[in-house]
Amino acid sequence: CALAEWKFGAGKGTKNMVFLTFGTGLGAGLILNGKLYTGTNDNAGELGHIRLSDFGPIGYGKKGSFEGFASGGGIAQLSKMYVMEKLQTGQKVEWCTLQELDQLTARKVAEEAAKGDKLAQSIYETSAIYLGKGLSMVIDILNPEVIVIGGIYTRNKNMMEPIMQKIIDQEALSCANRVCKVKPAALGEQIGDYAALSVAANLTD
């Protein structure tokens, strides 16, 4: 997917790009100096494992991890925490009862947030804050031209981008931040086809 977005999508024309999957989990693909970077034993890009907080949803087996805050599974966990807190204090959540708690999904919360529900919006705001914190580290360490984010971020960009960018502007090294753009993935449902093409092209380069 990283190769596809680099060769054909939102990262086309760059030499240094980071691609983040923001779906069931969180992972990254790194293009550095015009080449796919995989690390010493192919473990480069496991950004989801980074701990951003001592508390929070669990992702990659670690509480408060980047994946815990910035993935579908993590947002679902975060939602359960926020909703349970409301229910335990006797408050009603129109879109989720105690019996429905285990069925909560990131998509459901996004739908409610889009309708203007303040609780649902606060859940995505928390995710966006920690996304900004995580990306600030990426910008400081790798100094990329572009960070491309797929999945949930692409579908909820309007809700998440302003909060995420505010955190990046506060946290990231200003000289590195100035030259880095954060973009939603461009290839959408076609990314699988483009990925196959880009892998084949990369093997012949």
Model-derived features with residue positions:
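Glycine/small-residue-rich loop that forms an oxyanion/phosphate-binding "nest" at active or ligand-binding sites
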Residues: C1-E5, L20
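A short, polar/charged loop-to-alpha-helix boundary motif
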Residues: N43-G56
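Short glycine-aspartate micro-motif
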Residues: N16-T21, G27-G29
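ATP-binding/phosphotransfer module of carbohydrate and carboxylate kinases, centering on a glycine-rich
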Residues: E5-T14, L36, D54-D205
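Conserved beta-strand segments that form the floor/walls of ligand-binding pockets within enzyme
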Residues: T21, I31, R51, V148
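Conserved catalytic-core motifs of eukaryotic protein kinase domains, centered on the activation segment
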Residues: D42-N43, M160
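Short beta-strand scaffold segments in enzyme catalytic cores
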Residues: L3, L26-I31
